[in-house]
Amino acid sequence: MESRFIKAERDTKLKLNYDAGNIISPKVHSVGVLALGSYLENHGPVLPIDTDIKIASYLALNASIKTGAKFIGTVYPATEYPYVKHGIHVSVKDLIENIVSIMKLANKYIGIDKSVIVNAHGGNLPLKKHINVIERETGMKIVMNNKIVEIEGPHAGSGETSLGYVIGIADVERMNEIDFKKYPEIGMVGLKSARKLNKKIDEGAKIVEKEGVKINPKLGRKLLNIALNDIINDIKHLIRMDKNETK
């Protein structure tokens, strides 16, 4: 699948400076980094409803800056387990269609042929089973990075709130408004169906019930660094794959 970008470069005999700038390899220009989170989801009074996509975007853009890979934007919709009621979401099928559309445009206009999807929303985890569908539809190699979801802890808990504080989206003055009855989505403490049907959600809710929600800047920075390094490793892995395929 030849992109419009590659055809234009060939037809005009234009030579782009692929080796310019602070990049890890000239081959990194064919790697896209796409942020996936959730734009419409309650996180209590301290964090905004688009917390997940802002965390994903922060990580994706910083990984792009540190490696030279191309930040190709954000995915608008998100999916969720049917028993988790704290936001507005779509089906996995609709999510896949949206991602495929973005990937095809990235290939067509800027020559992206492999991508890392940086996910910061636990409800998007079912997408992992369908990455092969996206690869088949786009002709790309796709890696889905869920590291921040794996390490941040319960929804709107201390980990995620600390992340939000570090990147500048938390309203610290509203910490005293945290109330599990008024904001049942915090730690998913008040989401009874979700707790009943998902053991991990229930375990996380119990931790938040016991320990509350606290802001720890050191923890927030640590979580961001772990996730960022993991994303960078995925980008490097895709470049190595590209080198192996061209041997």
Curated annotation (Swiss-Prot):
Which molecular function terms from Gene Ontology are attached? 2-amino-5-formylamino-6-(5-phosphoribosylamino)pyrimidin-4(3H)-one formate-lyase activity; ferrous iron binding
Positions that bind Fe cation 1: 41, 52, 121
Disulphide-bridged cysteine pairs: none
Where, by residue number, does Fe cation 2 bind?
43, 52
Names of required cofactors: Fe(2+); Zn(2+)
Q: Does the UniProt entry include the keyword DNA-binding?
A: no
Quick one: which pathway? Cofactor biosynthesis; coenzyme F420 biosynthesis; Cofactor biosynthesis; riboflavin biosynthesis
Write down the superkingdom of origin.
Answer: Archaea
- Which of UniProt's keywords are assigned here? Hydrolase, Iron, Metal-binding, Zinc
Q: What is its EC number?
A: 3.5.1.102
Q: Describe its assembly.
A: Homodimer.
Its biological purpose is as follows: Catalyzes the hydrolysis of the formamide of 2-amino-5-formylamino-6-ribosylamino-4(3H)-pyrimidinone 5'-monophosphate (FAPy) to form 2,5-diamino-6-ribosylamino-4(3H)-pyrimidinone 5'-phosphate (APy).
Give the reaction(s) catalysed: 2-amino-5-formylamino-6-(5-phospho-D-ribosylamino)pyrimidin-4(3H)-one + H2O = 2,5-diamino-6-(1-D-ribosylamino)pyrimidin-4(3H)-one 5'-phosphate + formate + H(+)
Tell me yes or no: is Metal-binding among this UniProt entry's keywords: yes
- Please report the name of this protein according to its UniProt entry: 2-amino-5-formylamino-6-ribosylaminopyrimidin-4(3H)-one 5'-monophosphate deformylase
Q: Which free-text remark accompanies the cofactor? A: Requires one Fe(2+) ion for activity.
Q: What is this enzyme's class at the first EC digit? A: hydrolase
Biological process GO terms, please? F420-0 metabolic process; riboflavin biosynthetic process
**Family per similarity comment:** Belongs to the creatininase superfamily. FAPy deformylase family.
